Amino acid sequence: MMILPRTGFGRGADSVVLVLLWVLGSVLAKDTAFVEVVLFESSPNGDYTTYTTGLQGRFSRAGATISAEGEIVQMHPLGLCNNNDEEDLYEYGWVGVVKLEQPELDPSCLTVLGKAKRAVQRGATAVIFDVSENPDAIDQLNQVSEDPLKRPVVYVKGADAVKLMNIVNKQKVARARIQHRPPRVRPTEYFDMGIFLAFFVVVSLVCLILLIKIKLKQRRSQSSMNRMAIQALEKMETCKFKAKFKGQREASCGASDSVSSSSTSDCAICLEKYIDGEELRVIPCAHRFHKKCVDPWLLQHHTCPHCRHNIIDQKKGNPGAVCLDPGNPVHGRQQRVVLPVHYPGRVHRAGQVTAYPTRTSMDPHGNPITVLTVDQHPEQGLYPSQSSFIRGYPALHLDHTLNPHHCGLEHRGPAYPQTHTFKRPKFHGRNFSRAACFSQYETMYQHYYFQGLTFPQPEGQPSNGLHKGHNRPFQPGLLYPTVVHMAPASSSRLGDSGSTSGLSCYHGHRSVCSGYLADCPGSDSSSSSGQCHCSSSDSMLDCTEVSNQGVYGSCSTFRSSLSSDYDPYVYRSKSPCRGSAGEAGAVFSAAPPADDTSAPVSGMIDCLQPPGGACYSSGDQLSNCSLEPNCSNHSSVETRELTSTTSAGPLEGNVAERSHNSVKPCGEQGVACNCCFEVPKLNLERKGKEGEDRGHCRWATEAQAVASSQNFYSVSTEQLPSPDHVSYDGLPCCFYTEMTVHRGGANHYAEDCSVNIQYAQTDSDGCMGQGCCELAQRIPIIPEDTDCELGLGPEPQTSLLSSRLTTEREERTSSEDTCDLFFTSGQCRGQVYQQPQDEEARALFSSKCNAVSETQGSSTSSFDGSGL
């Protein structure tokens, strides 16, 4: 077979064929009719469902190539042969479908074109012919006519014709839409749905990613917390339980001093008693449980089951559980004060001091204690300038030699925010032309004291002889009601020029410095004894629930209530009072009588003069202290018992009046020394001499010189009678010594002032020695409160203030009348109270006042003989 090469003519023929095919295709594409049939199917409940079927046909030249739409109506070919126009009329808007029969069977009444015209005349928008059985009809429709129809004429065949006829025969409702081009899908038809889907997908992915990250972070944190809990648990203390010989059980571990638990003998989780040899877990909060009981809880919850203490925070170094060591010179401005929980004493501090509760645990003797941290040096710029009356309070911290450190915590610097709870009131002047007047609330704010301190047992020192009182030993470690009060420095009262008096009148109110003994019941009609038992005819309740002043410790005014005037356990002392300034300020002192033979005197007070010319600072004379319940159940117009005290107002008057006024001393003894509390025998030969050397001693001169230089008032226990050689009566007493140190500055507190507290229990037998602790003795808790015991007559207490004012007027008119108002304690109280006062009648001084001594020389100070 031979293949001839193609010539150029053949290539041209192929191109022509392709062009013809393209033109034919374009023509055919232009004549193609796209028929869209929409079916409506109804459901039994009335809903319609639509189905769309697409068919293809051809536009014939007999009609127009336009779009049309309408309801499908089937027409029979014989029906179109009727020439009657009045019959078979249809409304406009329908699409006629005609199935052509075979030519042999088709009636020749009308041609195919004539039938199309007849349908359009009857209202058809379009005519569709099925030419499957009569293909010759296509040629008839494509013949060019002079008058074509204005409506489309479409013919279909094949599969599309079968689908169309099935729809027409089976469906009652169908609608046809004829288009001359394929229906184009609008690009915005599904655009909104696409945007929604894209947004939903993006948000879902973001949320999923965040959830995964959070889950991973929680897992890492949980694993880290678990690791920290495991580490804390490994570092936590464990101990073996060991039963004591008397049945009392206590854990025996390496640091038992800082270990406590919610129960002494049983586990708070399983409620089973500890058995010898069982391993106990000691949590840093000092609670202990069975190791097998508490370890799973600690690993899961990381907190103590009893107090919710977080062991993780403890491991991280939570500042709330540290103990600031005042012995560190860097942090010497912090104090550590230990208070029992059951003795909720409050801290009232003048100036810029804030107390922070650090932690609560138990001491080695099982007593609950609270560790407070007192900040003494906040920022000075946040406070206004302070008056000289309240400036210069010394610092306080318990000496570690007497107060062993058993907290067992990490010692580091202060980690507390320097919060400023108080702001000073409107007292800005440095000099007072006269005594400043402060209200009782200022009094509470200016002073503070600590109640219920635990007995400071020295480390490594055996307890000295047990001081027995009422056949009861004084055991170390027990809680005894004591008061430790820090007085302002002397520079705050004596160092400023122009200050005639540093004393305050407190509005002339009768001051009652209150404390309490927490475990002693009492009520309105209660009474007290040396054993601190309060009996009541009404009820038995805690003394702390009776008076808020007893709970918080305050300086209150003369109180009168509707039902009760009970003030539990007023701290009192008969120690000599203080002078006000170096210019021979007058002071008062109270002493009980030795017997009941003195005449009653109303409104008279005792006098005890300080050494003439001695300039010593104001401080607390805590030589003796005791508790005495103020259990008067009478109204305010009745005469108070010895538990009531009065506050002397500020002493006014010029120096000339003071220098010329004299005092009538009583008794055989001379005026007591304010420093060593010794009463020198009265020298009758020195009757006409000056009184400036009266009551002085070598120790007093030295102590006062040191105290003045250091701005402290110092009381030494060396001059006090030893507890081993003196019998005591009443409740436990305390003695303390303030050890002064160098002050940081004029406006700052001292870095440290070590207070050594000594306790002694009195004996029921005689109490006539020096330093004797008595129930009727008054401790001047407030430095400015220099009042002394008044000999109250049977007149009401409400008349005391008026009596004072009257006496002041009498003093201004005549200085000699003032001297007649002053008596010794024997004359002041002898017959005012007729009831026996064996325990309350013992004075601080050993000798008794039996007779009135001779008049001393010209005194260095004068008195405002009215008192209150």
From Swiss-Prot:
Its EC number is 2.3.2.27. It is found in: Cell membrane. It is an enzyme of class 2 (transferase). It is a single-pass type I membrane protein. Residues 30-193 are extracellular. InterPro entries: Znf_RING (IPR001841), Znf_RING/FYVE/PHD (IPR013083), ZNRF-3_ecto (IPR040700), ZNRF3_Arkadia_E3_ligases (IPR051073), ZNRF3_Znf_RING (IPR045903). Residues 1-29 form the signal peptide. GO terms for molecular function: frizzled binding; ubiquitin protein ligase activity; ubiquitin-protein transferase activity; zinc ion binding. Keywords: Cell membrane, Membrane, Metal-binding, Signal, Transferase, Transmembrane, Transmembrane helix, Ubl conjugation pathway, Wnt signaling pathway, Zinc, Zinc-finger. One of its GO terms (cellular component) is plasma membrane. The chain crosses the membrane at residues 194-214. E3 ubiquitin-protein ligase that acts as a negative regulator of the Wnt signaling pathway by mediating the ubiquitination and subsequent degradation of Wnt receptor complex components. Along with RSPO2 and RNF43, constitutes a master switch that governs limb specification. Belongs to the ZNRF3 family. This is E3 ubiquitin-protein ligase znrf3. The gene is znrf3.
